[in-house]
C-alpha cells in the first residue's frame, strides 16, 4: 500500500516515506540494542513528533513510586502535581498494580454490548460509597462532564418540560471542565477558545462565589435552566476557595428553582481536599457528581457520573455510550483505587498534612511578604499566589524551573500562581523539604532570575475574557 501511495503521490511522498522508514528503523535498532535515551533526546523527540499543545517543565518521568519520580539519568524528584490530582494514592501503588495485573490476565474489554463480571461490582461499590442510586461510566474527565451535560439537558426536557432546544446550563467564570468543544464553550480561558469557534450555545456565566448573581440568573432564566455546573474549589483558576456558606446557598437556590446542582469533583474529589468530596466541607449533596482522575489512581483513565434514578434513567439505550466506559480492567482498578483511599485513611491524612503544609508555607510568606500575596488551599490541594510586581520580570513558570533544580516538581497555573498538590501518600519530611526549597528559591534564585530575564511590555499586559469581559488571572 505504501508503495502504491508513493507511486501516486510522486517522488516527494516516496522520499517522505523513505525518511520515515529510516528513522523508525534507526530508533527500533537502538531500542532493540538496549540503548538508553537521555532526557534531552526524549524531549527533543517529543518536540519534533508531538503536537505542541503543552508547555511542560523540562523533566522526563521514567519511574514513579509513591511521591517520588526518577528521570532517565536517575535524578530523584518529589512530585507536587500528582498528574493534576490523578495519583492521589501515589505513583504505582502496589495494590492497584496488583488489581491491574490480575485483571489484565483475565479480561480487559467487553464493551457495554455485553455484561462483564467486574463493572457491576464497581457500580455497586461506587454508588454505595458516595450515596447515589446509579452511575454512568466513562473514561476521561472531559467525557464525564460532557456526559453530565447531556444527562442534565435530557432531564430538563423530560422532567422539567423545557421547550425543545432551549435548555441552558449555568457555569462559573474561571471554570475549567476539560478541553472538548462542548466544555470549552463554557470556558473563560481565551487560549482554550480562540480559533475553535463556533462554540456550542446554551450556556450562561456567573462569577464563582456570587450567590446574588446566581439568584438573579435563576430568576431571569430559571424556567429554561436545567443545571448549574461548578467546581467546589476552582483548580485551574488557581485553587480558588468559595466564601463560607456558598455551597449551601447554591444547594438552596437550585432546590428552590428546580435546577440540578452539578458538582465537578474530578480534581477535588477522592480525598484530595481532606474530605472524600470537596462538597462535604459544607455537608451538601449535589444532584449530579462527576468523578475522574484519582478514580483510576493514575493507572488507567476512569470517570463516572453519579445521580439518582429519577435523573439517570432519563438516558435510554442508544442515547449515550462509550466503547471503553465500564470496561473490566478499569472497573477492577477503580475498586482497588477506592479501597486504598479508605484502607490507608487518605482523607484524614490529606486534612492533617495539608494543614501542616500550609503552616509551613505561611512561615515562608512571613519571610517574603512582598513576594507571596497568599497561601490558600484545603487538604493537599494548595496554591501560593505571588505578587506580579515583586516577581517581575520572572514568572511562576520560572520559579517552577528553579524548584525542579532543587528536586521539587510543581506547575504554575497562570503567570503568578503555583499549585502544590502532591500525592496523599507524601511524608511530613517531604513536605518540609518542599517548603524549604520554595524558601530557598525566593531567597537565592529569584534575585538572579530577575537580573537575567529581560523585562518586556507584553508580560505586563492585562487580558480579559472574550466571553464575559472579566479580568483574567
From Swiss-Prot:
Keywords: Aminotransferase, Mitochondrion, Pyridoxal phosphate, Transferase, Transit peptide
Cysteine disulfide partners in this protein: none
GO biological process, one term: response to heat
Transit peptide: 1-32
Residues found modified as N6-(pyridoxal phosphate)lysine: 293
Induction trigger: Up-regulated by SNAC2. Also induced by high-salinity, heat, and submergence. Strongly induced by abscisic acid (ABA) and auxin (IAA), and slightly induced by brassinosteroid (BR) and jasmonic acid (JA).
EC numbers: 2.6.1.13
Record-linked InterPro entries: Aminotrans_3 (IPR005814), Aminotrans_3_PPA_site (IPR049704), Class-III_PLP-dep_AT (IPR050103), Orn_aminotrans (IPR010164), PyrdxlP-dep_Trfase (IPR015424), PyrdxlP-dep_Trfase_major (IPR015421), PyrdxlP-dep_Trfase_small (IPR015422)
Function, in words: Confers drought and oxidative stress tolerance mainly through enhancing ROS-scavenging capacity and Pro pre-accumulation.
Protein name, as recorded: Ornithine aminotransferase, mitochondrial
Organism whose genome encodes this protein: Oryza sativa subsp. japonica
Lineage, opening ranks: Eukaryota, Viridiplantae, Streptophyta, Embryophyta, Tracheophyta
Amino acid at each position: 500500500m505504501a508503495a502504491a501511495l508513493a507511486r501516486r503521490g510522486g517522488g516527494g511522498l516516496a522520499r517522505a516515506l523513505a525518511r520515515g522508514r529510516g528513522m523508525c528503523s534507526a530508533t527500533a535498532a537502538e531500542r532493540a540494542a538496549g540503548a538508553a535515551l537521555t532526557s534531552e533526546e526524549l524531549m527533543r523527540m517529543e518536540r519534533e513528533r508531538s503536537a505542541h499543545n503543552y508547555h511542560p517543565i523540562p523533566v522526563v518521568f521514567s519511574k514513579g513510586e509513591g511521591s517520588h519520580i526518577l528521570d532517565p539519568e536517575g535524578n530523584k524528584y518529589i512530585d507536587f502535581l500528582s498528574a493534576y490530582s490523578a495519583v492521589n494514592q501515589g505513583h504505582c501503588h502496589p495494590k492497584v498494580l496488583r488489581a491491574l495485573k490480575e485483571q489484565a490476565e483475565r479480561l480487559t474489554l467487553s464493551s457495554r454490548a455485553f455484561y462483564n463480571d467486574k463493572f457491576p461490582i464497581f457500580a455497586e461499590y461506587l454508588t454505595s460509597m458516595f450515596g447515589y442510586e446509579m452511575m454512568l461510566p466513562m473514561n476521561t474527565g472531559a467525557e464525564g462532564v460532557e456526559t453530565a451535560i447531556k444527562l442534565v439537558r435530557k432531564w430538563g426536557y423530560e422532567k422539567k418540560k423545557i421547550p425543545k432546544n432551549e435548555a441552558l446550563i449555568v457555569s462559573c467564570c474561571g471554570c475549567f471542565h476539560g478541553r472538548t468543544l462542548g466544555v470549552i464553550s463554557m470556558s473563560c480561558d481565551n487560549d482554550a477558545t480562540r480559533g475553535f469557534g463556533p462554540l456550542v450555545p446554551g450556556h450562561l456565566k456567573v462569577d464563582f462565589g456570587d450567590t446574588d448573581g446566581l439568584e438573579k440568573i435563576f430568576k431571569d432564566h430559571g424556567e429554561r435552566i436545567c443545571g448549574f455546573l461548578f467546581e467546589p474549589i476552582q483548580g485551574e483558576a488557581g485553587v480558588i476557595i468559595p466564601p463560607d456558606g456558598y455551597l449551601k446557598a447554591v444547594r438552596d437556590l437550585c432546590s428552590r428553582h428546580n435546577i440540578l446542582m452539578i458538582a465537578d469533583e474530578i480534581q477535588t474529589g477522592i480525598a484530595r481536599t481532606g474530605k472524600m468530596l470537596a462538597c462535604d466541607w459544607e455537608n451538601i449533596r449535589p444532584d449530579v457528581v462527576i468523578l475522574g482522575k484519582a478514580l483510576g489512581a493514575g493507572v488507567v483513565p476512569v470517570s463516572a457520573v453519579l445521580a439518582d434514578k429519577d435523573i439517570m434513567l432519563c438516558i435510554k439505550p442508544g442515547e449515550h455510550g462509550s466503547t471503553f466506559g465500564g470496561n473490566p480492567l478499569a472497573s477492577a482498578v477503580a475498586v482497588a483505587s477506592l479501597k486504598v483511599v479508605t484502607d490507608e485513611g487518605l482523607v484524614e491524612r490529606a486534612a492533617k498534612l495539608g494543614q501542616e503544609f500550609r503552616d509551613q508555607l505561611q512561615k515562608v510568606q512571613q519571610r517574603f511578604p512582598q513576594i507571596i500575596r497568599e497561601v490558600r488551599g484545603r487538604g493537599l490541594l494548595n496554591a501560593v499566589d505571588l505578587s506580579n510586581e515583586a516577581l517581575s520580570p520572572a514568572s511562576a513558570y520560572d520559579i517552577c524551573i528553579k524548584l525542579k533544580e532543587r528536586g521539587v516538581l510543581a506547575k504554575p497555573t497562570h503567570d503568578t500562581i503555583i499549585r502544590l498538590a502532591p500525592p496523599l501518600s507524601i511524608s511530613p519530611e517531604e513536605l518540609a523539604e518542599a517548603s524549604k526549597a520554595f524558601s530557598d528559591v525566593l531567597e537565592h534564585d529569584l534575585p538572579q532570575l530577575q537580573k537575567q530575564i529581560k523585562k518586556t511590555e507584553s508580560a505586563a499586559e492585562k487580558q480579559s475574557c472574550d466571553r464575559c469581559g472579566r479580568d483574567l488571572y
